[in-house]
Amino acid sequence: MMKSDGNCQFRALADQLYQNSDCHELVRQEIVKQNMSLSTNSQWGDEVTLRVAADVYQVKIILITSIKLIPFMEFLPKSQKEPDKVIHMSYLAGIHFNSIYKKNKEKGSRSSSSSSSAVWMKLQRKKENEAKKKEEEEKERKDMEKEEKKKDKEDKKKDKEDKKKAKVQKEKKEKKEKKNRNHHFHYSE
């Protein structure tokens, strides 16, 4: 039974494709490449996402529904050839997807657990790379802030020096003018 967390369709697809419903984020990411509106986790999947999933993974998806008028639906990839893999899912009461298997076939026998482990490792590496990238971006942002503060400090220092120079020049000018006035006054006596 898939968790009812808004990711049930992607969990069911991950379970069918990789025998690991925890790979639902990877499945979502692959489908999102085709349909950007689904990038938010817990955004419900629908018929469109099943069509995209059939295309992305080149599989036939058979969806058993609880709808009397439509007991099942098939989703095929756009390619003309018949897909090698068929996956089965259920859609209950119009609100929840599950991964289902034929009774005589055990879940683990569908493929080796090593492929599931490889997918899990790929997902973990991707998460680690994203975290590392985020960390690098944060460091770069902090370095830029530090550089801006340093530049601001230098600019303030330069402004202070410029004001000091302007004050000295003004004082010199005033002194010179005063001297000229005194000198002029001296001659008029």
UniProtKB/Swiss-Prot annotation:
<dbReference type="InterPro" id="IPR003323">
    <property type="entry name" value="OTU_dom"/>
</dbReference>
<feature type="active site">
    <location>
        <position position="96"/>
    </location>
</feature>
<comment type="function">
    <text>Hydrolase that can remove conjugated ubiquitin from proteins in vitro and may therefore play an important regulatory role at the level of protein turnover by preventing degradation.</text>
</comment>
<protein>
    <recommendedName>
        <fullName>Putative OVARIAN TUMOR DOMAIN-containing deubiquitinating enzyme 8</fullName>
        <ecNumber>3.4.19.12</ecNumber>
    </recommendedName>
</protein>
<feature type="active site" description="Nucleophile">
    <location>
        <position position="8"/>
    </location>
</feature>
<keyword id="KW-0539">Nucleus</keyword>
<feature type="region of interest" description="Disordered">
    <location>
        <begin position="105"/>
        <end position="189"/>
    </location>
</feature>
<dbReference type="InterPro" id="IPR050704">
    <property type="entry name" value="Peptidase_C85-like"/>
</dbReference>
<dbReference type="InterPro" id="IPR038765">
    <property type="entry name" value="Papain-like_cys_pep_sf"/>
</dbReference>
<feature type="short sequence motif" description="Nuclear localization signal 1">
    <location>
        <begin position="125"/>
        <end position="132"/>
    </location>
</feature>
<feature type="compositionally biased region" description="Basic residues">
    <location>
        <begin position="175"/>
        <end position="189"/>
    </location>
</feature>
<feature type="active site">
    <location>
        <position position="5"/>
    </location>
</feature>
<keyword id="KW-0378">Hydrolase</keyword>
<keyword id="KW-0175">Coiled coil</keyword>
<dbReference type="GO" id="GO:0005634">
    <property type="term" value="C:nucleus"/>
</dbReference>
<feature type="compositionally biased region" description="Basic and acidic residues">
    <location>
        <begin position="126"/>
        <end position="174"/>
    </location>
</feature>
<keyword id="KW-0833">Ubl conjugation pathway</keyword>
<feature type="coiled-coil region">
    <location>
        <begin position="120"/>
        <end position="181"/>
    </location>
</feature>
<dbReference type="GO" id="GO:0004843">
    <property type="term" value="F:cysteine-type deubiquitinase activity"/>
</dbReference>
<comment type="similarity">
    <text>Belongs to the peptidase C85 family.</text>
</comment>
<feature type="domain" description="OTU">
    <location>
        <begin position="1"/>
        <end position="103"/>
    </location>
</feature>
<feature type="short sequence motif" description="Nuclear localization signal 2">
    <location>
        <begin position="163"/>
        <end position="170"/>
    </location>
</feature>
